[in-house]
Amino acid sequence: MEPGGGHSLPVLLLLLLLLLLRPSEVNGREAPCPRPCGGRCPAEPPRCAPGVPAVLDGCGCCLVCARQRGESCSPLLPCDESGGLYCDRGPEDGGGTGICMVLEGDNCVFDGMIYRNGETFQPSCKYQCTCRDGQIGCLPRCNLGLLLPGPDCPFPRKIEVPGECCEKWVCEPRDEVLLGGFAMAAYRQEATLGIDVSDSSANCIEQTTEWSACSRSCGMGFSTRVTNRNQQCEMVKQTRLCMMRPCENEEPSDKKGKKCIRTKKSMKAVRFEYKNCTSVQTYKPRYCGLCNDGRCCTPHNTKTIQVEFRCPQGKFLKKPMMLINTCVCHGNCPQSNNAFFQPLDPMSSEAKI
């Protein structure tokens, strides 16, 4: 036996033990995604820092806080693509960890100030804007949602609060509302405060809210948002049709003891129905599943398409409609709101879509 040969076996065993204790990485790469995802995601969604969105991880399983500029990233910890970031893994790009970097792009000029591509700024307390390759996109920091009339608040109105940036909705007697103007008119006027759009030489700051939740938990409903993405740069309300899931067989799945099924795709082609009209084309939409543990599943990533409907007497009409890409199950379930969950009336102002 060679000198020192008796120590080689323990060293080899130690190296083997270290490799066994690190199964999550192979040659600098993360282990493949687990299939199925069930059981590995936290029950509650992550609490991200202000301005940091929650996105699905690289496996499409769990919500994680998007990594910001200069932070480490990986397929399971993606960068904030909405902020113009990408995961720079170096020249080899082996699929392992990297650093979130800003995509190259043009700078933006607003109110005499130059902002770099991907840079976020606040022109006022009401708006947060981002420079994206020479274009400025802004989102309101205040809640621009409508407070619809209901039994408890038949005449809502938005007012300014001293010492606070954002307006608040209040409920006042009918006489005071009639003296002060209609609630919708007050809302439309105040929604453009803080940005002077009268100067045609100034940039029109894009302001678009997120789509509201679908008005029905099953069957055809509608959702709304407020935007000024038009030539007049005026705040208008947009509405689209939506269907989270069909109403028939609305039972939580107990397949192999699973508590939730986030997203499921229709096995057969279906036609959407809107009042007495039927979609011309057939679709295989994705629906949000149900849970039997008290959580609810809602759309996480969606897109809007134009659906053509065939109506009685040979008439045709087109309506924007939400299609679901992915859903997420969580405990922050929407509360019942009788003023919001109303039948979709095609003659009402809410149904002008």
From Swiss-Prot:
Annotated keywords: Cell junction, Cytoplasm, Disulfide bond, Gap junction, Glycoprotein, Growth factor, Proto-oncogene, Secreted, Signal
Keyword Cytoplasm: yes
SUPFAM superfamilies recorded: Growth factor receptor domain, TSP-1 type 1 repeat
Keyword Amino-acid biosynthesis appears in the UniProt entry: no
InterPro entries (UniProt xref): CCN, Cys_knot_C, Glyco_hormone_CN, Growth_fac_rcpt_cys_sf, IGFBP-like, IGFBP_CNN, Insulin_GF-bd_Cys-rich_CS, TSP1_CCN
Glycosylation: residue positions: 276
Any one biological process term the GO annotation gives: endothelial cell chemotaxis
Occurrences of domain CTCK (ranges): 260-334
One Pfam family from the record: TSP1_CCN
Ranges of residues in domain TSP type-1: 203-248
GO cellular component: cytosol; extracellular matrix; extracellular space; gap junction; intracellular membrane-bounded organelle
Coiled coil segments of this chain: none
Stretches assigned to the VWFC domain: 106-172
Every IGFBP N-terminal domain range: 29-103
Subcellular localization: Secreted; Cytoplasm; Cell junction, Gap junction
Signal peptide: 1-26
Main subcellular location: secreted
PANTHER family for this protein: CCN FAMILY MEMBER 3, CONNECTIVE TISSUE GROWTH FACTOR-RELATED
UniProt function note: Immediate-early protein likely to play a role in cell growth regulation.
Stated family: Belongs to the CCN family.
Protein name (database record): CCN family member 3
UniProt lineage: Eukaryota, Metazoa, Chordata, Craniata, Vertebrata
